[in-house]
Amino acid sequence: MINGSFRKYLEEAIGSDNALVAFSAFESPAPSSIRCNPFKSGICPEGRPVTWNAYGRILPERPVFTLDPHFHAGAYYVQDSSSMFVGHAFRRLLESAGKPVGRPFRVLDLCAAPGGKTTDLAASLREVFGDGFILVSNEVMKARAGVLADNVALWGDPNVVVTSDDPRAFAALPGFFDVIVADVPCSGEGMFRKDEEAQRQWSEDNVALCEARQRRITADVWPSLRQDGLF
């Protein structure tokens, strides 16, 4: 059952017809998808290709991933296909990015847990720059940072560094990063199909709280972005 406050909000925001399409999607089962690790080829499950990600696969059914040794070997990462679009946009950026002279290309994934974006970014950076990049993968919440570190270790790229710092700490590195990716805290509508509790907890007050957090995080980390860098 869709949260009544959210239903009213979305109908006013995008119109009743468009909202009806969204509500229908929320009520349908979520497909299961994975993104293969290009550097551990040949051991990725088969599936329907994801249009916007060369390594994405939509599976015919959801297996028990924890029983698959390939999952534990980092051969693939379980990720919603929609979340892979961040990697698609990042790859398009790298197509036009020049290689820095005398230093690696530097990227910060600021709100990185559990690691989906980081592993996707790492694959693209490795393809474009070879060993000439560094990706800082940060998660401020200590418990989630542990999960992030585990997933990064499974992925196996040595140019990824995991940290657990408040965004304001990166202001000590003025103009350091060429790109900052920030999946800032949000009100979680993307979880509605997976978690009924996420629907029940939605409120305009929570949206306002998330907005304030987003503004604070962005302002705190902004000094660490180089001039003409991309946020």
Predicted regions and their residues:
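S-adenosylmethionine
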Residues: M1-F231
